[in-house]
C-alpha cells in the first residue's frame, strides 16, 4: 500500500519549478540513498544545483508541505511507508567542495565527505582533523550531530556554519550558536546546513598521516565497513560503551528478518541483504529493551529514523519501566 503520492504533490508546486536548475523526482526510492539500502519512497525528492537554486525552491514550497533534508544517507534509517512531503538531497556538484580558506582553516560544503576534509588537512599540515577519516558520511551530518571519533569532535573545529532556513533566508552561525553537546547540536532543526568553516593548528604531515593510518586500521579491524550499515546504532551512555552493554545483553549477532547486529562490532546494525526498514528498527528497539533489562540503562538511538510505518508494521519505541 502506497503511503505517499509524489505526482500529486509535484502538481502543487506550480510553474515556479520550471525556473529551477536542480532535479525534482516524484516517488523517489530512498533505498537507493541510504547506506542500509532499505526503506520506502520520498514523496518528492529535490536535488538543488547550488545554494541559490535551493533558496529559489524554498521560496515556492508551500508552508504546509513537510521538508526533510538528507545527505549521503550514511546514518539514516527510512521507514517502509516512505517520507511525506519533500526530501532535499544536496548534490556533490553544488555542495561537495573542500578548499583551503586561510592558514589552518578549511571551508567545506555540506555534502563533502568527512574523510575529504581530513585528507585536505593532512596535505596542508593542519592538525585536528584526523578523526574525520574514520567517520562515514558528510560534513552536513557531522555538523548536525556533532560527529566525533578517535578523540576528536566536530565542535572542536567549527568556526562558523552556513545555513538556509525554510523561508529561503541565509544565516551564518557561530560555534556558540550551534549549541553543541555529545552527538547533538542545539541549532534550529529547520535550518539546512550548506557548508562550514573549520580551523585546526599546524602539525607535522607525517604525524597526521600516522594518526589517519591508525584510524583506518582501527576501522578495518573492528568495524563492518564493507557491509550495508549505518555506522554506530546507539550513542554511548555516559560512563559506558554501547557495544559492551549490547554484548552483555546477548545482542551480538542477533538477527531479526534481514537485519543483524554485527558479530564484528555489535553496535553496528547491518542489512544482510533483504532487510526492511521494519526489520532494522524492530531489531534496534529489541536491543534497547534487552540492554535495559540487563543493565537498567536506556540506549539512545544515534541513527536517525525518518518516515511513516506501513499499516500493521509499526514499531513501538521501548520506553523502559
UniProtKB/Swiss-Prot annotation:
GO terms for molecular function: FAD binding; UDP-N-acetylmuramate dehydrogenase activity. Gene3D superfamilies: 3.30.465.10, UDP-N-acetylenolpyruvoylglucosamine reductase, C-terminal domain, Uridine Diphospho-n-acetylenolpyruvylglucosamine Reductase, domain 2. Its EC number is 1.3.1.98. Its cofactor is FAD. The active site is at 183, 232 (proton donor), 302. Residues 36-203 form the FAD-binding PCMH-type domain. GO terms for biological process: cell division; cell wall organization; peptidoglycan biosynthetic process; regulation of cell shape. It is found in: Cytoplasm. It comes from the Bacteria. Keywords: Cell cycle, Cell division, Cell shape, Cell wall biogenesis/degradation, Cytoplasm, FAD, Flavoprotein, NADP, Oxidoreductase, Peptidoglycan synthesis. The keyword Coiled coil does not apply. It catalyses: UDP-N-acetyl-alpha-D-muramate + NADP(+) = UDP-N-acetyl-3-O-(1-carboxyvinyl)-alpha-D-glucosamine + NADPH + H(+). Pathway: Cell wall biogenesis; peptidoglycan biosynthesis. Its main location: cytoplasm. GO terms for cellular component: cytosol. Cell wall formation. Belongs to the MurB family. This is UDP-N-acetylenolpyruvoylglucosamine reductase. It comes from Agrobacterium fabrum (strain C58 / ATCC 33970) (Agrobacterium tumefaciens (strain C58)). The lineage of its organism: Bacteria, Pseudomonadati, Pseudomonadota, Alphaproteobacteria, Hyphomicrobiales.
Amino acid at each position: 500500500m502506497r503511503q505517499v503520492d509524489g505526482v500529486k504533490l509535484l502538481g502543487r508546486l506550480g510553474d515556479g519549478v520550471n525556473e529551477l536548475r536542480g532535479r525534482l523526482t516524484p516517488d523517489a526510492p530512498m533505498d537507493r540513498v541510504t547506506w542500509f539500502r532499505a526503506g520506502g519512497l520520498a514523496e518528492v525528492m529535490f536535488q538543488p544545483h547550488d545554494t541559490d537554486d535551493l533558496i529559489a525552491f524554498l521560496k515556492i514550497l508551500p508552508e504546509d508541505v513537510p521538508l526533510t533534508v538528507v545527505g549521503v544517507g550514511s546514518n539514516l534509517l527510512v521507514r517502509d511507508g516512505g517520507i511525506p512531503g519533500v526530501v532535499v538531497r544536496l548534490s556533490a556538484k553544488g555542495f561537495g567542495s573542500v578548499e583551503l580558506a586561510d592558514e589552518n582553516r578549511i571551508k567545506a560544503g555540506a555534502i563533502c565527505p568527512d574523510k575529504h576534509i581530513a585528507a585536505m588537512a593532512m596535505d596542508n599540515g593542519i592538525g585536528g582533523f584526523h578523526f574525520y577519516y574514520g567517520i562515514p558520511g558528510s560534513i552536513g551530518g557531522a555538523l548536525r550531530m556533532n560527529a566525533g571519533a578517535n578523540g576528536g569532535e566536530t565542535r572542536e573545529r567549527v568556526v562558523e556554519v552556513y545555513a538556509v532556513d525554510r523561508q529561503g533566508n541565509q544565516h551564518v552561525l557561530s560555534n556558540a550558536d550551534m549549541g553543541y553537546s555529545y552527538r547533538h547540536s542545539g541549532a534550529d532543526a529547520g535550518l539546512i546546513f550548506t557548508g562550514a568553516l573549520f580551523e585546526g593548528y599546524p602539525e607535522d604531515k607525517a604525524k597526521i598521516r600516522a594518526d589517519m593510518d591508525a584510524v583506518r586500521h582501527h576501522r578495518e579491524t573492528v568495524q563492518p565497513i564493507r557491509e550495508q550499515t549505518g555506522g554506530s546504532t546507539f550513542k554511548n551512555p555516559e560512563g559506558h560503551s554501547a557495544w559492551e552493554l549490547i554484548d552483555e545483553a546477548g545482542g551480538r549477532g542477533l538477527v531479526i528478518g534481514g537485519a543483524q547486529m554485527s558479530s564484528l562490532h555489535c553496535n553496528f546494525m547491518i542489512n544482510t541483504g533483504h532487510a526492511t526498514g521494519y526489520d532494522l528498527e524492530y531489531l534496534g528497539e529489541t536491543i534497547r529493551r534487552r540492554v535495559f533489562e540487563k543493565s537498567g540503562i536506556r540506549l539512545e538511538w544515534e541513527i536517525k529514523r525518518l518516515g511513516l510505518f506501513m499499516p500493521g508494521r509499526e514499531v513501538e519505541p521501548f520506553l523502559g519501566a
